[in-house]
Structures are given as structure tokens and as C-alpha cells.
Amino acid sequence: EPSLGLAPLVVKGIFEIIQEINKQGVTVLLIEQNANMALKIADLGYVLETGRITLTGSGRDLLKNEDVKKAYLGT
């Protein structure tokens, strides 16, 4: 969870670095509670509840999912 406890400006920088690493051809496995930021940069995402995968899909698809919005994105 690279953004845990960090100021928003620092979080933005961390995610920019993660994206740059990925653009260089490196696969990144990211475990992150900040679902909004993580899904924005994810090619593929998993939603876990009580240790089980409940949803999977592209980051974009998961951001649009109504259940994900309600439970994790505060909308």
C-alpha cells in the first residue's frame, strides 16, 4: 500500500512513478486501499472481500461498476 498515510500531493507523485515503471515494460502488482487511484492506472483489477475475489475486470470497468462505486469510491 504505497500511498498509506501520505499527503495527497505525495500520493500523486507515487502513482506517477508507478505508471512510469509500468511504461518501461515492468509489470506492477499493486495492493492499494486507494481504489480510485489504483483503478485509474490498472490494466486489470481485482476486488477482494473477506479474502475472496468478488469482482475482476479492467480498471476502467471496475471504476464504472455501481457496486464498486458504492462500496469503495464513496459515490
What are these regions (language model features)?
Residues E1-T75:
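Glycine-rich phosphate-binding loops of nucleotide-dependent enzymes
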